[in-house]
């Protein structure tokens, strides 16, 4: 039911696309000149075209191999800070659902990057982080510097918020460790991994051919399918509910998940609330009830689709007392479809508060949502009068959606709002929208306290890579989003908080250096 603009349909590009770096052929994989050449062989085999880095001597062997053996592929992006390098990879992963390489120097570069790694972990972003240490061979260490920049078990510094880390002891261990790291990283739920290489191991001459993985080997396990019997129960609950709500958070990590949710909503004619970790559902769709909190008092069933944060949308926080009030009607039922406890860590508390679920289903929503749609269609087909009843519900939702969007857009042109200083979020969102609305645009992260989401026409999956994260993350992730769309010729818009940029103003140099087009609209709140 959602409509697309001309730009979304691909009839217009904002600028000339910049093609991806072309991968050169390496004829003798596993038999280069130096051990670090084997790492490059694996990077070529796993097809990751970019590597964001801040150079350091601990991986000078790998750096040399990337240039002289790998033909400068992956393309190396010089960054002003390791944190920014990881954030660029984070934004790229958000926008493409594919991993990117970030390379960090020794212990100090790893420690510089660890906040960005933590945010990638809690945001489930697949980032292949390469680091280096040592030399562990004491006789090869340079005075002082190699001693103070080396740690025993260096991966321990980020082990609590990465999915996997490894440090191969021999060159023959490099391919298997790399392959396992990639598999762990890309198995849902995704997350960053850290691969550490000893400095002297990289620089030693390769004296034998290393056994490489078969090019036909499966790199990642198949997606996890949910239990059919439990899915049938969920479908019956969804069909019998008077006012169900689909609560989506990470189901939009892929185009397939986005499209599947549209089909499910159109089948069931029910409300959808997008928590915006990724763009899960079109903002222009008449069943999109995101940011319309008054609907919660009518909801009798919530179906979470790859949702971690159940509490924030379903409760009202009283900040002064740190207490919460439920928004939900008494007797509302809850069904959780996603990865449940598979990501849980004994260290990080990102798993949120435990909910009283009526059904809990483990499975990938890329599979579960189409399965749920099929089951619901079968129930509709054999239940007389149900289809017209559902369509009537959909019409009421569409009326509320249209009314709310009209009110939001009026707020952006309201005379009193336009006199406020600093500029009101609704006004700034409106002004930017009037300039970009006929382009094929992408919003990188922050949405001006969701006013861009209220006013702009989010009519395609690529429009938004997901909501903003913590302070000092937006400019870096925005560059990664812009890099991901660089070959599409789209207009990339970053609604940039001023205080966030001050953490890493050098990021703008990275954009200029590596030809990453992006419109940065600075929101200065006159504070920080």
Where are these regions (language model features)?
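Glycine-rich phosphate/diphosphate-binding loops that line cofactor/substrate pockets in enzymes
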Residues: 13-15, 37-49, 91-97, 184-189, ...
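Glycine-rich, anion-gripping cofactor-binding loops and their flanking helix/strand elements
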Residues: 90, 94, 248-343, 457-488, ...
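Active-site diphosphate/adenylate-binding microenvironment
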Residues: 35-49, 54-58, 62-67, 398-486
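Thiamine diphosphate
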Residues: 139-150, 296-298, 369, 451-528
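Active-site nucleophile and cofactor-binding loops and adjacent substrate-binding regions
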Residues: 53-56, 76-87, 102-110, 169-170, ...
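N-terminal cofactor/phosphate-binding cores enriched in small/glycine residues
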Residues: 30-118
């Amino acid at each position: 039911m959602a409509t697309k603009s001309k730009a979304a349909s691909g009839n217009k590009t904002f600028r000339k696309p910049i093609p991806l770096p072309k991968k050169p052929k390496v004829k003798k994989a596993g038999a280069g000149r130096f051990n670090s050449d084997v790492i490059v062989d694996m990077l070529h085999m796993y097809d990751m075209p970019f590597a964001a880095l801040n150079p350091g001597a601990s991986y000078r062997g790998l750096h040399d191999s990337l240039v002289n053996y790998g033909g400068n592929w992956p393309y190396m992006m010089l960054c002003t800070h390791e944190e920014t390098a990881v954030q660029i990879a984070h934004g790229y992963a958000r926008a493409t659902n594919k991993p990117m390489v970030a390379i960090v120097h020794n212990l100090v570069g790893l420690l510089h990057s660890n906040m960005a790694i933590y945010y990638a972990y809690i945001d489930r972003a697949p980032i292949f982080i390469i680091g280096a240490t040592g030399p562990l061979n004491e006789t090869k260490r340079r005075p002082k510097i190699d001693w103070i920049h080396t740690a025993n078990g260096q991966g321990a510094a980020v082990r609590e918020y990465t999915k996997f880390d490894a440090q191969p002891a021999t060159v023959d261990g490099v391919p298997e460790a790399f392959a396992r790291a990639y598999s762990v990283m890309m198995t849902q739920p995704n997350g960053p991994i850290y691969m550490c290489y000893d400095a002297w191991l990289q620089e030693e001459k390769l004296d034998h051919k290393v056994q490489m993985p078969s090019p036909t080997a499966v790199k990642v396990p198949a997606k996890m399918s949910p239990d059919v019997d439990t899915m049938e129960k969920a479908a019956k609950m969804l069909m019998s509910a008077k006012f169900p709500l689909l609560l989506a958070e990470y189901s939009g990590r892929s185009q397939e998940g986005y499209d599947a949710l549209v089909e499910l909503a159109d089948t069931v004619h029910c409300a959808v609330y997008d928590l915006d970790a990724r763009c899960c559902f079109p903002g222009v769709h008449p069943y999109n009830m995101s940011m319309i909190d008054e609907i919660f008092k009518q909801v009798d069933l919530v179906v979470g689709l790859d949702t971690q944060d159940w509490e924030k949308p379903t409760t009202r926080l009283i900040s002064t007392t740190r207490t919460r009030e439920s928004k939900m009607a008494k007797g509302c039922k809850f069904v959780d479809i996603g990865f449940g406890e598979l990501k849980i860590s004994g260290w990080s508390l990102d798993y949120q508060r435990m909910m009283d679920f009526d059904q809990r289903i483990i499975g990938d929503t890329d599979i579960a949502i189409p399965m749920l749609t099929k089951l619901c269609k079968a129930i509709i087909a054999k239940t007389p009068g149900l289809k017209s009843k559902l369509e009537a519900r959909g019409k009421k939702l569409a009326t509320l959606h249209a009314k709310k969007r009209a009110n939001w857009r009026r707020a952006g042109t309201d005379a009193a709002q336009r006199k406020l200083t600093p500029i009101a979020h609704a006004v700034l969102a409106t002004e930017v929208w009037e300039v970009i609305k006929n382009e094929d645009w992408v919003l990188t992260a922050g949405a001006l306290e969701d006013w861009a989401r209220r006013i702009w026409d989010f009519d395609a999956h690529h429009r938004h890579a997901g909501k903003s994260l913590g302070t000092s993350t937006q400019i870096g992730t925005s560059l990664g989003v812009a890099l991901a769309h660089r070959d599409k010729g789209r207009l990339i818009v970053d609604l940039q908080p001023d205080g966030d940029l001050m953490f890493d103003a050098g990021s703008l140099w990275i954009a200029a250096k590596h030809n990453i087009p992006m419109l940065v609209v600075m929101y200065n709140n006159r504070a920080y």
